[in-house]
């Protein structure tokens, strides 16, 4: 059972074979060799019994990777760098991208491995859980066993920088105060919301006020609001006791669940809205959420990292980005369609960059 709040081996899964038939009729009678006997039962105290004299007749003992080790190995080492030119003029086909995407391990958390009493009441989806090694722990309230729990993970950004983002689920009625506690604790100055409140069914509760409201010990006020064609920007203040901080809230609603926007332009404009001097100056992570906190959330974070790679290096490793995201929070980027759209969006961004200098 794992309860960690903040560990991130790759190897091929070897197959063991004993080769051809090893029993041959001896020309003369010889003492029969003892067979190698292996008895192993999970959870039992049965011993491993080997005739050491017979070890030379079989293949050398080697370690066998567990599926978990294989998953981590893939996510830590896989990559497919694409230059700006390749991304624009010779991109992988949709079929190739689908095949590539389907090979990426999801790295979802087994509910049995999340040993946190009462967490289920704070999970919007019972199978979408925070990976233990990178989960956010609330540190202020200590009155209950599960008081540190929120369904959220720290996410690395460009060049592997730690805690650039927090990916989380859309707040629920009983987690709104926890959400604002996380915003305060982590000194968050930007929240990016990528879902509507309802899309057939509830995806997220209305966790900010129309004017002013208290959520637990935090007083939230709306200071300003600007409507853009694809998104709405609100300037908020969050106050705790005598201290007051500013938080920018961006609601991008033109993105259907499990799908992609109609075009890549609005998403790139959203990324540009985030790229401000204020964002760069703030040391706290950017909170990003949709409903489950993995699909649209993963696409936005991957798009921003991809833009930064293209601008700085002239190439982008989208496969490597998604693998890094899934190490931090399982299931980031939910569908092959989203993976294909990510390539399309970054190809459009590459075309907008200044021409590369001649070698």
UniProtKB/Swiss-Prot annotation:
UniProt modification remark: Oxidized at active site cysteine. Treatment with pervanadate (vanadate and H(2)O(2)) or with antigen enhanced oxidation of active site cysteine.
Signal sequence range: none
Region span, Disordered: 1-33
UniProt keyword terms in alphabetical order: Cytoplasm, Cytoskeleton, Hydrolase, Oxidation, Phosphoprotein, Protein phosphatase
Modification Cysteine sulfenic acid (-SOH), positions: 290
Stretches assigned to the Tyrosine-protein phosphatase domain: 97-349
Main location: cytoplasm
Subcellular location: Cytoplasm; Cytoplasm, Cytoskeleton
The protein, known as: Tyrosine-protein phosphatase non-receptor type 7
Organism: Mus musculus (Mouse)
């Amino acid at each position: 059972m794992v309860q960690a709040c903040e560990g991130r081996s790759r190897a091929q899964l070897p197959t063991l074979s004993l080769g051809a038939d090893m029993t041959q009729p001896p020309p003369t009678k010889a003492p029969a060799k003892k067979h190698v006997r292996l008895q192993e039962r999970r959870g039992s105290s049965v011993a491993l019994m080997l005739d050491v004299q017979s070890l030379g007749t079989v293949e050398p003992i080697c370690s066998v990777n567990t599926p978990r080790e294989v998953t981590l190995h893939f996510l830590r080492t896989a990559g497919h760098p694409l230059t700006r030119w390749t991304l624009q003029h010779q991109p992988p086909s949709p079929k190739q991208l689908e095949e590539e995407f389907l090979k990426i391990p999801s790295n979802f958390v087994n509910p049995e491995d999340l040993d946190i009493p009462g967490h289920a009441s704070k999970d919007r989806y019972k199978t979408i859980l925070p990976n233990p090694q990178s989960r956010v722990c609330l540190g202020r309230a200590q009155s209950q066993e599960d008081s540190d729990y929120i369904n959220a993970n720290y996410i690395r950004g460009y060049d592997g920088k730690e805690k650039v983002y927090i990916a989380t689920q859309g707040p629920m009625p009983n987690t709104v105060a926890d959400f604002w506690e996380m915003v305060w604790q982590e000194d968050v100055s930007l929240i990016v919301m990528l879902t509507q409140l309802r899309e057939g069914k509830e995806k997220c509760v209305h966790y900010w006020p129309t004017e002013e409201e208290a959520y637990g010990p935090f007083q939230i006020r709306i200071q300003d609001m600007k409507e853009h064609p694809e998104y709405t920007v609100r300037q908020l203040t969050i106050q705790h006791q005598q201290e007051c901080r500013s938080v920018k809230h961006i609601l991008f609603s033109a993105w259907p669940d499990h799908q992609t926007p109609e075009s890549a332009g609005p998403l790139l404009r959203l990324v540009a809205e985030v790229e401000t001097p204020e964002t760069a100056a703030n040391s706290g992570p950017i909170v990003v959420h949709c409903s489950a906190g993995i699909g649209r959330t993963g696409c936005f974070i991957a798009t921003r990292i991809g833009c930064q790679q293209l601008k700085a290096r002239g190439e982008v490793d989208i496969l490597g980005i998604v693998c890094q995201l899934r190490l931090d929070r399982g299931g980031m980027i939910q569908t092959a369609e989203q993976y294909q759209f990510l390539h399309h969006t970054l190809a459009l961004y590459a075309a907008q960059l200044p021409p590369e200098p001649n070698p």
